[in-house]
């Protein structure tokens, strides 16, 4: 449980440092807010090509204009897994104009 908590905090901190809007949570499910359905689908597809499996959620699963990428963290993730995911989010976020 301690490792899961550490992994969640580490991932969220890294993502926020890059400029991503992360919905506050106490769980291991992290919502990276993108607000646009097509963007969330494209972002998730590009992450999969980078070896990162995530789900893009959009209306009607979440309210309109609250599309997001759902990241499920676990205690089995090692720091290098988290770093790879953060780096992939950074690369694609810049390509798609989500972050600078």
Residue locations for each model-derived region?
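Conserved PLP-binding catalytic core of the aspartate aminotransferase-like
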Residues: 1-12, 16-51, 61, 65-69, ...
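PLP-dependent enzyme catalytic core of the Aspartate aminotransferase-like
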Residues: 49-53, 60-100
């Amino acid at each position: 449980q301690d490792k899961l908590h550490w992994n969640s905090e580490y991932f969220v901190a890294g993502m926020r440092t890059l400029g991503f809007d992360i919905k506050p949570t106490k769980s291991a499910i992290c919502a990276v807010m993108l607000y646009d359905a097509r963007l969330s689908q494209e972002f998730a597809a590009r992450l999969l090509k980078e070896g990162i499996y995530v789900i893009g959620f959009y209306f009607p699963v979440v309210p309109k204009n609250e599309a997001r990428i759902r990241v499920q963290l676990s205690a089995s993730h090692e720091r290098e897994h988290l770093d790879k995911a953060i780096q992939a989010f950074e690369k694609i976020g810049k390509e798609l104009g989500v972050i600078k």
